[in-house]
Amino acid sequence: QRQMCIRDRSDVAIHTAKNHANKENIDINYILGEAENLLPEKNEHFDVVTCLEAIEHVPDPNQLVKTCSNLCKKNGDIFFSTINRNPKSFLFAIVGAEYILNLLPKGTHEYEKFIKPSELIQMMENNGLTIKELTGMSYNPLTKNYWLGKNVDVNYLIHAKKI
């Protein structure tokens, strides 16, 4: 039997997610804490590992990639999403989202921690992952619509397979 397990460092995020899951009657195992704390008992345990909008907030992104790779089974899928590091991403993700539109609390992001796709791809490949797809994610704050596309200037998603 397959089970969904979600681990997060934020008790607020887990509480919010639990409320959403309960409304949808979805059975999810929520765990508060660091992904690294799942090792070694969950080594190569998961079919799919996602690390969404988190890697730009940790002190050692490469260590997080390594942990995610270690948690994933052979031939499993891994997804990372994060923010590119360039002037456009600074303008959109920090100035726009945090200071003009107030979509996020001020200080949520540090520009220096943004990661270029080439940097994340290198970390992933160094940890036994084969890149399958790089996709851009865009958001229109006026229409509140999200979409996927080729533009990776600001937000992007990478899918990889564990060798």
Language-model segments: which ranges?
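Acceptor-substrate binding/catalytic loop of class I
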Residues: 82, 101-119
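Conserved SAM-binding strand-loop segment of SAM-dependent methyltransferases
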Residues: 23-40
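Conserved SAM/SAH-binding beta-strand->alpha-helix loop
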Residues: 10-12
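Short alpha-helix
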Residues: 111-134
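A short glycine-rich, Lys/Arg-flanked "PGG" loop and its adjoining helix->strand segment in the class I
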Residues: 62-77
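Short, small-residue-biased leader/transition segments that mark boundaries at the very start
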Residues: 1-6
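Conserved class I S-adenosyl-L-methionine
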Residues: 77-102
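A conserved beta-strand element that flanks and buttresses the S-adenosyl-L-methionine
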Residues: 50
